[in-house]
Amino acid sequence: MADQDVDLDSIIDRLLEVRGSRPGKQVQLLESEIRYLCTKAREIFISQPILLELEAPIKICGDIHGQYYDLLRLFEYGGFPPEANYLFLGDYVDRGKQSLETICLLLAYKIKYPENFFVLRGNHECASINRIYGFYDECKRRYNIKLWKTFTDCFNCLPIAAIIDEKIFTMHGGLSPDLNSMEQIRRVMRPTDIPDCGLLCDLLWSDPDKDITGWSENDRGVSFTFGPDVVSRFLQKHDMDLICRAHQVVEDGYEFFSKRQLVTLFSAPNYCGEFDNAGAMMSVDESLLCSFQILKPAEKKQKYVYGAMSSGRPITPPRKQKK
């Protein structure tokens, strides 16, 4: 389908039409429209840097994981684009029931507002992961496997990290023992898969751990964990104020670490119907003051109504509770 045959505004309108409907109502776009979203967004990702340099004011969101109606709630809170600038930190697909609507709306907004709307790559924007955790099955059930491969081509071109006003460093996972200079990120060529180890892997997979010093192995079996000393040294070396990342369920939707030098954001409330966590979005104003907007979890009793539909897939382990 040629670009001029695709009505982007109509795609966005249909994706937003289900606002106010019962959560779970699907939007079935044409396959040709989804292909357009993937190929056009991929062109834009490639034309922009792999390490984005962004300006405040901006709103930052963590994992969404196919919880489409919660994504719509985030926009209701923060303002639908272009009312506010947005940066999403990855993990749009898998685990939730509506990965397709979620990723399609995000790609549509990227195409419509390329300089105001930004999406980073999470560890689930990777074929070997989303083949297993739900996105492949959703594509196969609702469309076909070829379309899943088209998404893979798009995901392989997503940017990896962003710096806001030279002071806030953002990525999906965390720091890497291999990261000495920002130039190393800029040198990564796209399209690329996520390797099993090294800089790119760590930026999407690593986790902070308050109980360690330096670097340690990660319970996920991938990448590392890093202590507060690593965070402090990194910020001092690069003259930055804050690391903002996602990748872990946190009870309040956001959680500080290392004397407020790092914050974890998670934007999928009642994650998978199996947690009672809130979701959060971080607003960064022009003076780089950070505030949080919270999506409260549903009442506990609802959890058992909706949670009965568990997919049986293993869940991202929650952060260790404070002793």
UniProtKB/Swiss-Prot annotation:
Mn(2+) 2 binds at residues 91, 123, 172, 247. The active site is at residue 124. SUPFAM superfamilies: Metallo-dependent phosphatases. Keywords: Cell cycle, Cell division, Hydrolase, Manganese, Metal-binding, Mitosis, Protein phosphatase. Its EC number is 3.1.3.16. Binds 2 manganese ions per subunit. The keyword Nuclease does not apply. Its cofactor is Mn(2+). Gene3D superfamilies: 3.60.21.10. Signal peptide: none annotated. GO terms for biological process: anisotropic cell growth; ascospore formation; chitin biosynthetic process; chromosome segregation; DNA damage checkpoint signaling; DNA replication checkpoint signaling; establishment of cell polarity; intracellular monoatomic ion homeostasis. The keyword Aminoacyl-tRNA synthetase does not apply. It catalyses: O-phospho-L-seryl-[protein] + H2O = L-seryl-[protein] + phosphate; O-phospho-L-threonyl-[protein] + H2O = L-threonyl-[protein] + phosphate. One of its GO terms (cellular component) is kinetochore. Mn(2+) 1 binds at residues 63, 65, 91. Pfam families: Metallophos (PF00149), STPPase_N (PF16891). Belongs to the PPP phosphatase family. PP-1 subfamily. This is Serine/threonine-protein phosphatase PP1.
